[in-house]
Every structure is written in structure tokens, then in C-alpha cells.
């Protein structure tokens, strides 16, 4: 992941019940229920919105990268050469601003879906009330005799993954 690439879809070849399968695993911010990145930021630049999105305010971020260091997936990435510190304290902190997926927060505020959800050709990505998403995840997992990741793992996340392969 980079500051310009908030979502990376990893292609994985696996064997399930003796059959070779290709899985496509999106790698992006999991929007944790209790995000360590939001609590550790000394500048309070990270916060979790009511809609579940964990967002970094680029006008408050000094690029210290503590959020990346505590993220189980090392998702937030620094973009050098931008940010408030250039004007306020040019020799201070991390030389940039941290960026990551924010679920297209501006789109959510307008009542639109995140770009990845709207663009997904297989409708594998969904967004909505937690109860509805969990019910859909459970149904999909049941149909494929699969597994759900994100309900309780790492404290629970606003992002759930369903897979025919165990996440362990």
C-alpha cells in the first residue's frame, strides 16, 4: 500500500478440499472497532466516525507514523512533502502526512457508497448497517462452508472478510 493506493487486491492461489482455487483478498484499512491508531496519535489527527470509518485529518497530522506502528496490518503510510508541518514546524516530526483508506468518507457524507464498493464487478464488497452486513456475511460463509474474519479478531473491525479458507 502507498499513500496513493488505499486498496490493494492480493491474488492468492490456495487448495480447498483438494481443489486449486484463486482467492482475491483486498488489503486496506480494516476500520477497527477500537482503533489503536486513533488513540495513540499525539495530535488527535485520527478518529472513528459514527459511520464506522477511521479517518486521518491531514490538517492535523504531523506524520509521526505512530498510527502505522500500532496498526496490526501496517496500513497507514506516509506521504512526504505535504502537510501542515511544512508551514508550521518544517523541521519537526515525520516529514509528511499519514494516509489510508477512509471508506471514501466524503462520498459517505453525501450518501454515496465508497468507490471500491461501487466499482466491484462481483459485488463482493458491501456497506451498510452492521447487522445487515453480518447477516449477509454469515449467509455467504454458510453457502461456501467458509469463515468470517473481523467480527471479533483484533478487537473487531468494521470490515468483514468471508473466505472458503480459514484465516489462521
Regions found by a protein language model. Give the residues of each.
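Non-ligating segments of multi-cofactor redox enzymes
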Residues: 1-168
